[in-house]
């Protein structure tokens, strides 16, 4: 991996940068029953969704455990969402389980490309190609079969969904001199506290443990949906004891998704959480996203990967 790729994330560079989002998928949900069907499956209340906005929500098991995290928005006469590619096939199969009696079509689009664009020049450069792009009031813009999503965290950036053979693609690619590694986007997602749920870590956490309430992706009043009973119980009885965190540090070897994290207490280490995502920033720095047990003194605490003496991490997101 090119080290300059990730170091960029520490500063909002002026220069426009572009990456292919190879580890994300684009799914559409259409049909006359798509609203009611999705409403009974996801944690967000679709009645509140506006056509010019994208939102974050989760799709859960009947027991309330998160199968995947979705970035969802209205698209044509239905809905569309972005999720991690490693979970897409499994998530679609789960979503389709009860669709036999509904007029709904759930499809992973394979004829499209997802691009991530960032940098202070990004808006100006994109306006050379498009009539408009998302702004302060809008986070979704669609033009000529191209969808542009605006992200505000950790700073302004854009996700573009475009068909592989769309002539506009070449115009977009001509804006940059080189293509950056796709993990630059993953690092930005970690820095923005977007929960990264890949296949090998799904069905493990409740939405509250992934900060879905803070992200306005969890509705407890909309009525029945998959996992709602257990999710509501956790909320009203205050049973959640885990929270999402962004940690920075060093480890050799590089940690893996699902690895256990330990916190230092006096002279000993005890287990306190799990890794959701890992990005190597440079030879001396690694970012990880993790779910940790609630503990009042985390700000000054030292963490490590379980039984790895050559690892050292601290919380960055507070």
From Swiss-Prot:
Coiled coil: none
Positions annotated to bind folate: 24, 185
An annotated GO cellular component: cytoplasm
Compartments where found: Cytoplasm
Principal location listed in the UniProt entry: cytoplasm
GO biological process: iron-sulfur cluster assembly; RNA modification; tRNA processing
UniProt keyword terms in alphabetical order: Cytoplasm, Folate-binding, tRNA processing
InterPro entries reported in the protein's UniProt record: GcvT/YgfZ_C, tRNA-modifying_YgfZ, YgfZ/GcvT, YgfZ/GcvT_CS, YgfZ_barrel
GO MF term (any one): folic acid binding
Biological role stated in the UniProt entry: Folate-binding protein involved in regulating the level of ATP-DnaA and in the modification of some tRNAs. It is probably a key factor in regulatory networks that act via tRNA modification, such as initiation of chromosomal replication.
Similarity remark: Belongs to the tRNA-modifying YgfZ family.
Record's protein name: tRNA-modifying protein YgfZ
Organism this protein belongs to: Buchnera aphidicola subsp. Baizongia pistaciae (strain Bp)
Lineage of producing organism: Bacteria, Pseudomonadati, Pseudomonadota, Gammaproteobacteria, Enterobacterales
């Amino acid at each position: 991996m090119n080290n300059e790729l990730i170091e960029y994330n520490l500063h909002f560079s002026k220069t426009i940068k572009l990456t292919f989002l190879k580890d994300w998928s684009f799914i559409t949900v259409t049909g006359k029953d798509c609203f009611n069907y999705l409403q009974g499956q996801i944690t967000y209340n679709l009645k509140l969704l506006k056509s010019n906005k994208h939102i974050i929500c989760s799709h859960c098991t009947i027991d309330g455990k998160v199968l995947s995290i979705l970035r969802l928005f209205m698209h044509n006469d239905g809905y569309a969402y972005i999720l991690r590619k490693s979970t897409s096939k499994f998530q679609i199969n789960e979503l389709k389980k009860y669709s036999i009696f509904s007029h709904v079509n759930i499809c992973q689009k394979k004829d499209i490309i997802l691009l991530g664009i960032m940098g202070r020049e990004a808006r100006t450069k994109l306006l050379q190609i498009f009539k408009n792009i998302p702004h302060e009031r809008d986070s979704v813009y669609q033009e000529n079969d191209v969808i542009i999503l605006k992200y505000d965290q950790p700073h302004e950036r854009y996700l573009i969904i475009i068909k592989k053979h769309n002539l506009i693609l070449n115009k977009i690619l001509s804006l940059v001199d080189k293509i950056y590694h796709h993990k630059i986007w993953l690092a930005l997602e970690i820095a923005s506290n977007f929960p990264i749920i890949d296949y090998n870590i799904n069905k493990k956490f409740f939405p509250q443990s992934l900060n879905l309430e803070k992200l306005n992706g969890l509705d407890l009043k909309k009525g029945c949906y998959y996992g709602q009973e257990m999710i509501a119980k956790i909320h009203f009885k205050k049973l959640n004891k885990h929270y999402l965190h962004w940690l920075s540090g060093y480890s050799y070897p590089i940690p893996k998704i699902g690895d256990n994290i330990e916190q230092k207490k006096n002279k000993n280490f005890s287990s306190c959480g799990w890794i959701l995502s890992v990005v190597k920033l440079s030879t001396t720095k690694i970012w990880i996203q993790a779910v940790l047990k609630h503990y009042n003194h985390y700000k000054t605490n030292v963490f490590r990967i379980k039984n790895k003496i050559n690892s050292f991490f601290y919380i960055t997101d507070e």
